[in-house]
Amino acid sequence: MAGHSKWHNIRHKKAKMDAKRGQMFTKIIREITVAARQGGGDPEFNPRLRIAIEKAKKANMPVENIERAIKRGTGELEGVSYEEVVYEGYGPEGVAIIVECLTDNRNRTTGEVRHIFTKHGGNLGSSGCVSFLFEEKGVILVPKDKYDEETVFEKAIEAGAEDVITDDEEFYEIRTEPKELYTVKENLEKEGIEIEKAELTRIPTTTVEINDEETATKLMKLLDALEDNDDVQKVYSNFEMSQQLMEKVS
């Protein structure tokens, strides 16, 4: 298994997030608010907001919560102003970690993220220390039980995608240039392709293999602690781990 935010891990992630629905709502609301602030409150003309709203609906977030978050972003309602901050650091065995945050207090978040790294055997680095080990991509997941590989590949390339990865048992992973994600998604939907998830992500270009249970346990505790922080939106890392070991330490 490669990387903590790789799609192979979606079942583990879903179970974890279902158990923390309130925290998940908080993170999605922040994303909606920031998206609306940056690109306006109309999802028709704001692809980032459109994706965030779709995520909220899939999580069964009440419509009024979504509408309030949009209005806070556009300034129609008073609300907290969030800043996007990215942290970079290292975990056990030199695993590279990127942490994307939305925060109303950068100093607080920096202190908390630094503490989590230190507590779990990692260390917070400087900006740029590991980001060169990742590529930013758009990723679209399409369920494998609905379509054959040839159909998905053909539709994806026609829609403007770069590639289709077929390693996962449940999903085809369609990759795009970051700026093309929303266009490719819309083109696929026009062709009747069902999409499980569409998101901007960071994909590791080099990986660190983790084989022993002790290191794997430390690493997963670090990554989980980061994700459990309210200010953290996404965590990326470049580890490789067998499915068996992942299940054992998750």
Swiss-Prot record:
Pfam families for the chain: TACO1_YebC_N (PF20772), Transcrip_reg (PF01709)
Gene Ontology molecular-function annotations: DNA binding
Keyword field contains DNA-binding: yes
Disulfide bond entries: none
Keywords in alphabetical order: Cytoplasm, DNA-binding, Transcription, Transcription regulation
Gene3D superfamilies: 1.10.10.200, 3.30.70.980
Localization per Swiss-Prot or TrEMBL: Cytoplasm
GO BP annotations listed: regulation of DNA-templated transcription
Keyword field contains Transmembrane: no
Major localization class: cytoplasm
Cellular component annotations (GO), alphabetically ordered: cytosol
Family classification: Belongs to the TACO1 family.
NCBIfam families, alphabetized: PRK00110.1, PRK12378.1, YebC/PmpR family DNA-binding transcriptional regulator
Name of this protein: Probable transcriptional regulatory protein PERMA_0079
